[in-house]
């Protein structure tokens, strides 16, 4: 199953807008209607230990020789559904067909990625609606259980 972005299927990394660092997504479990909002990066920097030949090629280099190199590697974005434990359990049971994956926003930096993840989680009120969302925390700082006793009402802010 591929991702959907602006009503188009995305099945390859070349189909993303140019300079995309990552994206904010919504995974929806169709039978229950529950969703999960999260973020995913497209590339990872991975430390790879230098082999004997690569180390030998560095002889004569002044100063400390590097013992590793950074390798840019594509992430598992194509097969990713979310990090939430309930979603993982459903996937282990072989229920991938029951999920719909939608990209909400593509971004160019790590900071924007975190900002828009939080923005969408707040806009959709993921912590206030535990019957509609799998999300049980935002940033590992705000938790559903901490808001259990609070009655949420629609706030109307009047502007002058």
Where are these regions (language model features)?
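Short, polar/flexible loop-turn hinges at active-site or ligand-entry regions and domain interfaces
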Residues: 107-108, 127-131
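IQ-motif-like calmodulin-binding regions
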Residues: 140-153
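Short, surface-exposed loop/turn motifs at beta-strand boundaries within globular domains
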Residues: 18-20, 94, 129
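Short arginine-rich
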Residues: 119-129
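GIY-YIG nuclease catalytic motif and its immediate N-terminal context
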Residues: 1-51, 150-160
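Short, flexible loop/turn segments with low-complexity composition
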Residues: 129-140
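Conserved short loop/helix modules at catalytic or binding sites
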Residues: 40-110
